[in-house]
Amino acid sequence: KGTMYNSGCKIDIIDTQKKMGDLFVHTGKIKKGTINIGQSVNLEIDLEKRNNSKANHSATHLLHESLRRTLGKHVTQKGSLVSPERLRFDFSHNKPIEKEEMSKINKIVNEVVESSTDVQTRIMTPKEAIKMGALALFGEKYGEEVRVVFMGKESNGFFSTELCGGTHVKNTKEVGKFKIISQSSIASGVRRVEALRDKQLTEHENSQEKDRTLKEKTNKEQLEKIKKEILSYKIKPDLSENKDLVENLKNLNKQLEKIKIQNVIKDKNKNKIKDKKISDFIIREQVLSDFPPKELRSVIDQGKKDIKKGIII
């Protein structure tokens, strides 16, 4: 991404793709002026977006290998998205990633990042690359020569070895702190993870913390409100010290619901009952105000006990 311009026009480049070998296709939006075939233009890269895309691309390679080491060698890439803001990776796996596995995947990636090792690239034949253990995309067509990207030095070689023609960081430390923020299933046997790194991750975590703080404040206010309402019925709220705020809030809501139901049933203005007796048969007309519909079954059950033979309306 960047800008294409000359004295007569300015175009914002929003995407660049390599097609049919060495043909580069730029997709852009004209912001000013006009452009004609044959004109010369200047190209200016948006360095911040470029650097973020590089780091997210390198992080994707580290993520791929970390997934394979944690979940198993059956993990293969099924798709990916690398943008300046985030990265997304689709892979073969038939069940959700467990909490312990997720922690391990993130830990492995961050350990390679923190090792601060140089990223290496080499040009070789596809056969040589595969012999070295390089991962290749199934169904992808490769030429006589391929570019292989090596990341993270280990005693017996490299942490990650993949065929790749894309842009990458020079050193793993440029990736910054990494974390998977979501996972989902997109097809049978295919999982998707989305991840953030560095500045975007910090912003995401700060936003989450802000949301948590606000939610906790709202829950505390709601808890106090319910406690006061329960006390207004001259009943002591039942709170457990062993349960967290959210659990206590749920329990108090249930207590308040039961109290309200009992008070409606006891209140003759809100629970109007009119029985009409025909021989040994009773027709009961009952009108309830401010009563939750889901609790009507309990009222009907009580009515059955009151009248052995009859109809409740």
Residue ranges and their predicted role:
Residues 10-11, 74, 172-177, 181-313:
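Terminal appendage regions of diverse proteins
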Residues 84-186, 195:
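Non-catalytic interaction/regulatory segments
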Residues 1-4, 55-71, 75, 157-192:
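Conserved phosphate/anionic-ligand binding catalytic regions in large, soluble enzymes, centered on
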Residues 7-10, 19-22, 35-37, 83-85, ...:
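Short flexible coil/turn linkers enriched for glycine and charged/polar residues
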Residues 25-29, 43-49, 86-96, 195, ...:
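Short, hydrophobic beta-strand segments
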Residues 78-116, 207-212, 216-238:
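Extended, well-ordered alpha-helical scaffold/bundle regions in very large, multi-domain proteins
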Residues 1-43, 48:
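Conserved nucleotide-binding/hydrolysis modules and their immediate coupling elements
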Residues 1-3, 36-91:
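Active/ligand-binding-proximal structured segments within catalytic/core domains
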